[in-house]
């Protein structure tokens, strides 16, 4: 991953790098890989995340339609 440093502005380049890493999901991946996760725990977590996403989508849909 590359970030251009313009006019020796390292702070701005660092912010751009963090934003790129956030968009790519690198921080989340690092957090998940920090400890070993058993396959059964991984399936349970992914299932819970899918349910959460579905509920959120349904809530947004209902809010938009005005129910």
From Swiss-Prot:
NCBIfam families: S21p. It comes from the Bacteria. One of its GO terms (biological process) is translation. Belongs to the bacterial ribosomal protein bS21 family. This is Small ribosomal subunit protein bS21. GO terms for molecular function: structural constituent of ribosome. InterPro entries: Ribosomal_bS21 (IPR001911), Ribosomal_bS21_CS (IPR018278), Ribosomal_bS21_sf (IPR038380). The lineage of its organism: Bacteria, Pseudomonadati, Pseudomonadota, Alphaproteobacteria, Rhodospirillales. Keywords: Ribonucleoprotein, Ribosomal protein. The keyword Ribonucleoprotein applies. GO terms for cellular component: ribonucleoprotein complex; ribosome.
């Amino acid at each position: 991953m590359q970030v251009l440093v313009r006019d020796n502005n390292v702070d701005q380049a660092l912010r751009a790098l963090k934003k790129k890493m956030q968009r790519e999901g690198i921080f989340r991946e690092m957090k998940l890989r920090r400890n070993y996760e058993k396959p059964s725990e991984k399936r349970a977590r992914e299932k819970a995340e899918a349910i959460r996403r579905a509920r959120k989508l349904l809530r947004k849909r209902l809010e938009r339609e005005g129910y």
